[in-house]
């Protein structure tokens, strides 16, 4: 799995109807205050091991400032929330040509299952998790705090 974590003071997502270009009213826009916006990419080899490790690490990561201005508080400590966005483009391969290849991204059925399982694992860690819509054209807005952006790649981490 590949995750781009951004510490935010707020974040939101809505879905755009690809035919009309208008906001899709069948999707209730999601909004969080302080917390994380997670861009989540899945590959076919991802499963429970990657899900569990990432959910635990993200839930306990200390990147929020304490009273001394040090990154020493977790998302739990600040009563933060998570906005999780599926994003297969994190597996773009741009080595050849000018159009990215996404062959390393997980098959849609598998990726959707893993993404939902990951969101559930975050909830099991006690986090409030809002979601975009898998496979949809979304508009994601966020206000970075810091900025703090951390990239997790379970392949590179050997997980």
Swiss-Prot record:
GO terms for molecular function: D-tyrosyl-tRNA(Tyr) deacylase activity; Gly-tRNA(Ala) deacylase activity; Ser(Gly)-tRNA(Ala) hydrolase activity; tRNA binding. One of its GO terms (cellular component) is cytoplasm. It holds the Pfam family Tyr_Deacylase. InterPro entries: Daa-tRNA_deacyls_DTD, DTD-like_sf. One of its GO terms (biological process) is D-amino acid catabolic process. Keywords: Cytoplasm, Hydrolase, RNA-binding, tRNA-binding. It is found in: Cytoplasm. The keyword Cytoplasm applies. Its EC number is 3.1.1.96. A motif (Gly-cisPro motif, important for rejection of L-amino acids) lies at residues 146-147. It catalyses: glycyl-tRNA(Ala) + H2O = tRNA(Ala) + glycine + H(+); a D-aminoacyl-tRNA + H2O = a tRNA + a D-alpha-amino acid + H(+). Signal peptide: none annotated. A Gly-cisPro motif from one monomer fits into the active site of the other monomer to allow specific chiral rejection of L-amino acids. Belongs to the DTD family. PANTHER family: D-AMINOACYL-TRNA DEACYLASE 1, D-TYROSYL-TRNA TYR DEACYLASE. Homodimer. An aminoacyl-tRNA editing enzyme that deacylates mischarged D-aminoacyl-tRNAs. Also deacylates mischarged glycyl-tRNA(Ala), protecting cells against glycine mischarging by AlaRS. Acts via tRNA-based rather than protein-based catalysis; rejects L-amino acids rather than detecting D-amino acids in the active site. By recycling D-aminoacyl-tRNA to D-amino acids and free tRNA molecules, this enzyme counteracts the toxicity associated with the formation of D-aminoacyl-tRNA entities in vivo and helps enforce protein L-homochirality. This is D-aminoacyl-tRNA deacylase. It comes from Bifidobacterium adolescentis (strain ATCC 15703 / DSM 20083 / NCTC 11814 / E194a). The gene is dtd.
């Amino acid at each position: 799995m590949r995750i781009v974590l951004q510490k935010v003071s707020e974040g939101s997502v809505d879905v755009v109807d690809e035919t009309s270009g208008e906001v899709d009213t069948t999707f209730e826009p999601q909004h969080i205050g302080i917390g994380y916006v997670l861009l989540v990419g899945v590959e076919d080899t991802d499963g429970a091991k990657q899900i569990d490790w990432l959910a635990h690490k993200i839930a306990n990561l200390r990147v929020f400032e304490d009273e001394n201005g040090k990154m020493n508080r977790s998302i739990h400590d600040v009563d933060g929330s998570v906005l999780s966005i599926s994003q297969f483009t994190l597996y773009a391969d741009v080595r050849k040509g000018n159009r990215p290849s996404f062959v390393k991204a997980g098959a849609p059925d598998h990726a959707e299952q893993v993404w939902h399982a990951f969101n559930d694992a975050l909830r099991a860690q006690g986090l409030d998790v809002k979601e975009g819509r898998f496979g949809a054209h979304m508009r994601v807005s966020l206000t970075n705090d810091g900025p703090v952006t951390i990239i997790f790649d379970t392949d590179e981490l050997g997980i």
